[in-house]
A protein has these predicted regions:
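Surface-exposed, low-hydrophobicity beta-strand/loop segments enriched in small/polar/acidic residues
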Residues: 2-177
Length: 177
């Protein structure tokens, strides 16, 4: 077996000649957070229901995504992903037809059970879609967009298996900018 001395992107950039600047959202950036909560309606919350929880700048790198919830019945499950905002700012260079549509429905979590009440739980890569490599990228890149739209994107919880009880769901996204 051989031993190696392998460098991450940050260390490789530091050691390069000439030095390569690492984006502040990867090393040395400031952390910020956005959070929100909703109350479910109970039996009316069918698969496909979307809860718009918070907004994150498209150019930010997501540090963590934490969800907490009340017990929401016998088979309830949700996805946590990224959507276009419900309002596209004038001058953003985007068609208003993308407003409120999905970008990546399960970037952070897929079919996550919300049957039992849960304290804040980190789901940054619960789905397997937000891989270790993606976690060093800006949100727009991690979502698979071709370019940075330069606006805040919505982080949403979408119902994948009907929620049959009334209760609260909360989400907190910490990001570097």
């Amino acid at each position: 077996m051989t031993t190696y001395n392998i460098k991450s992107t940050v260390i490789t950039n530091r050691d390069a000649t000439p030095k390569v600047l690492t984006d502040a959202y990867v090393s040395g950036g400031n952390l910020a957070a956005s959070q929100g909560y909703v109350q479910t309606f109970g039996a009316a919350d069918a698969a496909g229901t979307i809860y718009r929880m918070c907004q994150v700048p498209s150019s930010a790198r997501v540090e963590s995504v934490k969800i907490q919830n009340d017990a929401l019945a016998t088979s309830a499950a949700v996805n946590v992903g990224v959507y276009w905002p419900t309002f596209i700012p004038v001058g953003a260079g985007l068609s208003t037809s993308v407003a409120a549509t999905v970008i990546n429905t399960a970037l952070f979590a897929s079919a996550l059970s919300v049957v039992a009440a849960a304290k804040p739980t980190d789901i940054t890569n619960s789905s397997g879609n937000n891989s270790i490599v993606n976690q060093e990228l800006a949100l727009w890149q991690a979502c698979g967009l071709a370019s940075d739209p330069g606006i805040d994107l919505d982080v949403c919880v979408s119902v994948s298996t009907a929620i049959q009880a009334q209760g609260y769901i909360g989400l907190k996204v910490t990001y570097a900018k």
